[in-house]
Design a protein with these regions (language model features):
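Extended Gly/Ser/Thr-rich low-complexity repeat segments
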Residues: 27-29, 41, 300-302
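Low-complexity repetitive segments in secreted/extracellular proteins
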Residues: 2, 40-41
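Low-complexity, glycine/proline-biased repetitive segments and flexible coils/loops
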Residues: 2-23, 46-302
Length: 302
């Protein structure tokens, strides 16, 4: 009786044999000396998107004006080739004397693009200084300093009022607030900064520092790293330093350092060389390479 299942017919055995030894691509696989399996090298980028933020200005002396934010410049499709300079601006120091103005922040540079450092806040006897954004007016009642950089990179600082209410530093997105007296001396808030999504995440930069006063206020720094009263601007935002309460220690509201960010398609090669004086990170995400320079100066080659 036949049994279902099993194999019918001769066994099918593999007949392919492989020679031992070293294998190589045959002449038939090469056309005019070019392998049919080429390795493609990435080419250098020809344009980049950039964000360049300068260092924020320092706050003025006791109850002094808030520091102005560092200049804010950004654009897309900037043509680039060869070598260029990158510099990340430092924040300006807060005044160490009652009457002194805060120091101006340092410029940040990318190739031919220069963002201007933020203006220093005014002190008891010294007017604020101009910058990417202007410093806040003195507690003696001076006007806030203007934003003089060209192209426009920020806004003016707020005006001071009487002896104990200084103006807030200007921000990239708004002027600094004025000092006021609604039943007590109040320093002006720092001007708001401006948001950028160049890294793939929205981050606000270049807020102005808060104006100082006689001790009754809770003035705040502008969004984007501006220092609250008696507080330094945030590192790598270009935020202005916050003016202190009248009886607080001097020199506490330094400006925040700036930042330089470059972005291009990840189908292009990495930057060839980056000067040893620069501190940076490289991230690749969403189809882009993003170089973030956070300190120093040096030459970069595409």
């Amino acid at each position: 009786m036949p049994v279902n299942g099993g194999n019918i017919g001769p066994r099918n055995l593999p007949s392919l044999s492989v020679a031992s030894g070293v294998w190589s691509i045959s002449d038939a696989q090469i056309y005019h000396g070019v392998s049919l399996f080429p390795v493609f090298a990435l080419v250098a980028p020809t344009s980049v998107d950039y964000l360049v933020v300068a260092g924020g200005g320092g706050a003025g002396g006791r109850a002094g004006g808030g520091g102005g934010a560092g200049g804010f410049l950004t654009s897309t499709g900037f043509a680039i080739s060869g070598s260029f300079t990158v510099t990340v601006g430092a924040g300006g120091a807060a005044s160490e004397t009652n009457a002194g103005a805060g120091a101006v922040g340092s410029n940040s540079v990318f190739s031919t693009i220069t963002s201007t450092g933020g203006g220093g806040g005014g002190g008891e006897g010294t007017n604020p200084t101009v910058g990417g954004s202007g410093g806040g007016g003195t507690p003696g009642g001076s006007a806030g300093a203007s934003a003089t950089a060209s192209p426009a990179q920020g806004n003016a600082g707020g005006n001071g009022l009487s002896a104990f209410a200084a103006g807030g530093g200007g921000g990239a997105g708004a002027v600094g607030g004025n000092g006021s007296y609604p039943g007590g001396y109040l320093g002006g808030n720092g001007g708001a900064g401006t948001a950028s999504s160049i890294t793939g995440t929205s981050v606000t930069y270049a807020g102005g520092g808060a104006g100082g006063d006689g001790g009754f206020s809770t003035a705040t720094g502008g969004a984007g790293g501006g220092g609250n009263e008696g507080t330094a601007g945030t590192v790598n935002t270009g935020g202005g330093g916050g003016g202190a309460f009248y009886h607080d220690p001097l020199g506490v509201g330094d400006g925040g350092s700036g930042v330089v960010i470059l972005k291009y398609a990840d189908t292009s090669a990495d930057l060839t060389t980056i000067g040893g004086g620069l501190t940076y990170t490289l991230t690749t995400s969403g189809g882009f390479k993003v170089y973030k320079f956070t300190a120093g100066t040096g030459t970069v080659t595409i």
